[in-house]
A protein has these predicted regions:
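Thiamine diphosphate
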Residues: 11-197
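Acidic, Ala/Val/Gly-enriched low-complexity intrinsically disordered segments
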Residues: 4-5, 10-12
Length: 197
């Protein structure tokens, strides 16, 4: 048992050193929310997840500019976002990559084959902010981008503050050309008042 504990401690130290040695950026939750407002998103369908809850989901739930729809499964959110587009309402589905992987059939049918402007923002649970998505140790993180590319789904990587400025234009493109878009968040968005090194 001691061997396992010491191995875990060594792994924790290795990850801690890697994160301290490499410069990485925490994303601004308020910056992302400002882009969603700029894109005229009115509804956010979401399940709570560990990656986006503090910096996005909770602030969105308290913001009167958005209506939050809590869904039980991510594929419900795909249908809701697609249906809202018929009313002229712009929506965003907020989830983590495990929910995305679980919803691929709905995304394939509703978003891709029926060409619906389903906009999805994906928190990558288990991704070290210092690593690239393609190099992630977590298997479910590593396979997300290639799967989305294989499907032909427009994918936007959000790794830093400069990338955040791509959100509004990508959402507008999705609604103008009736195509889905998926944003992959390279690190957990920080809530206002959070301090990072």
């Amino acid at each position: 048992m001691t061997l396992v504990v010491s191995s875990l401690s060594a792994l924790d130290l290795k990850l801690s050193k890697k994160m301290n040695d490499e410069k990485f950026v925490k994303l601004s939750g308020s910056g992302i929310i400002a882009e969603l407002k700029k894109a005229r998103i009115q509804v956010v369908a979401a399940l709570p997840d560990i990656v986006t809850s503090d910096g996005l989901l909770w602030p969105i739930s308290k913001n009167s500019d958005f209506r939050l729809i809590r869904v039980c499964k991510e594929d419900e959110g795909v249908s809701i976002c697609a249906a809202l587009s018929y009313t002229g309402t712009r929506a965003l589905l907020l989830m983590q990559q495990t929910g995305l992987l679980d919803s691929l059939n709905s995304i394939r049918a509703i978003a891709m084959e029926y060409q619906q402007p389903v906009c999805m923002m994906i928190g990558l649970q288990g991704k070290n902010p210092a690593e690239k998505i393609a190099d992630a140790e977590n298997y479910s993180v590593r396979i997300v981008k290639p799967i989305l590319q294989l499907m032909g789904l427009k994918t936007v990587i959000i790794e830093n503050e400069k990338d955040i400025s791509k959100i509004a234009a990508s959402i507008s493109y999705a609604y103008e050309f009736e195509q889905p878009v998926c944003f992959l968040l390279g690190s957990p968005p920080k809530a206002d008042g959070d301090e990072y090194d």
